[in-house]
Curated annotation (Swiss-Prot):
Keyword annotations: Activator, Chromatin regulator, Chromosome, Methyltransferase, Nucleus, Repeat, S-adenosyl-L-methionine, Transcription, Transcription regulation, Transferase
Residues carrying the site annotation Histone H3K4 binding: 253, 274, 325, 343
Job description of the protein: Histone methyltransferase that specifically monomethylates 'Lys-4' of histone H3. H3 'Lys-4' methylation represents a specific tag for epigenetic transcriptional activation. Plays a central role in the transcriptional activation of genes. Also has methyltransferase activity toward non-histone proteins.
MORN repeats (start-end): 15-38, 39-61, 62-84, 109-131
Binding positions for S-adenosyl-L-methionine per the UniProt entry: 234-236, 304-305
Gene3D superfamilies per the UniProt record, alphabetical: Histone H3 K4-specific methyltransferase SET7/9 N-terminal domain (2.20.110.10), SET domain (2.170.270.10)
EC number: 2.1.1.364
Region described as Disordered: spans on this chain: 1-21
Domain SET: 222-344
Organism name: Halocynthia roretzi
Protein name, entry field: Histone-lysine N-methyltransferase SETD7
Cross-referenced InterPro entries: Hist-Lys_N-MeTrfase_SETD7 (IPR017155), MORN (IPR003409), SET_dom (IPR001214), SET_dom_sf (IPR046341), SETD7_N (IPR054533), SETD7_SET (IPR044436)
GO molecular function list: chromatin binding; histone H3K4 monomethyltransferase activity; histone methyltransferase activity; protein-lysine N-methyltransferase activity
Length: 386
């Protein structure tokens, strides 16, 4: 977001535009620099003065108003992916309020800058609905002893010590946030805080699902419970504890992290609680952890399949489990309803399922479901529910 090169002589770049009697840029013009950057804007006797916009070689841009050659006031930096940083500048340096947005226009950061470094109370927003709130340190990092991770319900929190945004130790709290998302005016008011358990960053490995497998997630515990499924031969299922709206995160899907090649090369009987996380990594809940007597840190693996689901899988950046999947509603769900997702095993032309792409129980259900169902519905399921 550099706004330098404030004095521009004609021989410093390829300049096109109005000039003064001394052959300096004066009025509207455009300069192409040897770096590949380009500036279009207003000049006064060789100095940027007035509205202007940098077009950088990496396809990002920076626009705003220039005073005596320096960006002053609101400047808008647009990355090549469409994400935006809207900041206050003083003499070319970020100084004051700043906002950041993802390519879809959702806010991802709000806070303050001093001499180009983040300072004071800052708010970090994640696309899954969670957020981090706290005072950054002198380096602008979210490293302190009073940081709050806020769950999507904006009342359940984990408050404690964080290092560069990673949770070190934290306790469950009930909080009140003043102001809508993106417009909060202060650190959350803590209504109550539990003395235990203490939560820590606990990202799984290929061999360890959790160092504390019997410590449940406080947010998930308020929304769901496991009980025998109403679906025949499905074992346990997951049920809603209360009425919830569409697009509500209900449960988290943590597990050991395996390579996709390993998962794809083993028998389907070993993949009953396995889900893809990325193109390379899958999450798996091994058989010994299926029972809540042995593992209840997350319950997303309890959600069963349906061709008419009320939920879908989504990604989630969890303060304890790291990057995982979650279960999110696709319509309103009532208290006592069983949560279901579409497992999205690959299939083609109506009732025909690729033999190598789905377990037998799924192929049997698909044959039943496929009767009198338009082929295009089946073909589009993966796009609708994954």
């Amino acid at each position: 977001m550099d706004s330098s090169d404030d004095e521009i002589a004609c021989d410093e770049g390829d300049y096109k535009g109005a000039k003064d009697d001394n052959d300096l840029p004066h009025g509207l013009g455009k300069v192409k620099f040897s770096s590949g950057d380009e500036f279009i804007g207003a000049f006064e006797h060789g100095i940027k003065c007035g509205p202007g916009k940098f077009h950088f070689f990496d396809d990002s841009t920076l626009e705003g108003n220039y005073v005596d050659g320096e960006l002053h006031g609101i400047g808008i930096y647009t990355n090549d992916d469409g994400s935006i940083t809207k900041s206050t500048y003083c003499e070319g340096v970020m100084e004051g309020p700043s906002w950041e947005y993802d390519p879809e226009g959702n806010i991802t950061f709000r806070g303050q800058y001093s001499e180009g470094v983040r300072c004071g109370l800052c708010f970090y927003y994640f696309p899954d609905g969670g957020s981090l709130i706290g005072n950054v340190n002198a380096s602008g990092d979210l490293s302190a002893d009073n940081i709050a991770y806020i769950y999507p319900d904006r009342t359940t929190a984990l408050i404690g010590s964080f290092e560069e945004g990673d949770m070190i130790t934290a306790k469950e709290a009930n909080v009140t946030i003043t102001g809508e998302k993106g417009e909060e005016i202060s650190f959350p008011t803590v209504n109550s805080i539990s003395p235990d358990p203490v939560y820590r960053l606990d990202v799984s490995t290929p061999h360890v699902i959790s160092t504390r497998p019997l410590v449940p997630d406080p947010y998930e515990s308020e929304l769901v419970y496991a009980a025998p499924s109403k679906i025949p031969n499905a074992g346990e299922g997951l049920y809603a504890k209360c009425d919830v709206d569409q697009d509500t995160v209900m449960a988290f899907y943590n597990g050991v992290r395996l390579k996709q090649d390993e998962v794809e090369n083993r028998d389907w009987s070993q993949n009953s609680n396995t889900i893809s996380l990325t193109d390379d990594i899958a999450i798996d809940v091994p058989e010994e952890y299926v029972s809540t007597d042995n593992y209840c840190a997350s319950l997303g693996h309890k959600v069963n399949h349906s061709f008419d689901p009320n939920c879908r899988y989504d990604i989630y950046q969890h303060p304890r489990f790291g990057f995982i999947k979650c279960v999110r509603t696709i319509r309103g769900v009532s208290e006592g309803d069983e949560l279901t997702v579409h497992y999205t095993y690959e299939h083609n032309d109506g009732n025909k399922t690729r033999e190598a792409e789905a377990p037998e129980w799924y192929k049997s259900q698909l044959k039943v479901f496929g009767v009198d169902r338009p082929a295009e519905i089946l073909e589009n399921m993966d796009e609708d529910y994954c």
